[in-house]
Curated annotation (Swiss-Prot):
Designated name of the protein: Polcalcin Bra r 1
Pfam families the record matches: EF-hand_7
Amino acids binding Ca(2+) 1: D14, D16, D18, K20, E25
Keywords: Allergen, Calcium, Metal-binding, Repeat
Domain called EF-hand: residue spans: 1-36, 39-71
GO molecular function, one term: calcium ion binding
InterPro entries: EF-hand-dom_pair, EF_Hand_1_Ca_BS, EF_hand_dom, EF_hand_pair_protein_CML-like
CDD domains in alphabetical order: EFh
Gene3D superfamilies found in the cross-reference section: EF-hand (1.10.238.10)
Lineage: Eukaryota, Viridiplantae, Streptophyta, Embryophyta, Tracheophyta
Residues holding Ca(2+) 2: D49, D51, D53, N55, E60
PANTHER family to which the protein is assigned, alphabetical: EF-HAND CALCIUM-BINDING DOMAIN CONTAINING PROTEIN (PTHR10891)
């Protein structure tokens, strides 16, 4: 998946346009993919937010997307 596709999806998740994905934004995006629990969101944040600042940067998102191409293909179909 190309960086342009990662950027497109990232911007869909980053609903307030501040350049990072918060836990609340991640939860809203995951709800579009199906049912999601608060524990699911917490686990995803812990996995993707590698610097531990409580937000997902574009770099963190891209690294996760590159490591999980199958999942990102499914996400791209929805977004």
């Amino acid at each position: 998946m190309a960086d342009a596709e990662h950027e497109r999806i990232f911007k869909k998740f980053d609903t307030d346009g501040d350049g990072k994905i918060s836990a609340a934004e991640l939860e809203e995006a995951l709800k579009k993919l199906g049912s999601v629990t608060p524990d699911d969101v917490t686990r995803m944040m812990a996995k993707i937010d590698t610097d531990g600042d409580g937000n997902i940067s574009f770099q963190e998102f891209t690294e996760f997307a590159s490591a999980n191409p199958g999942l990102m293909k499914d996400v791209a179909k929805v977004f």
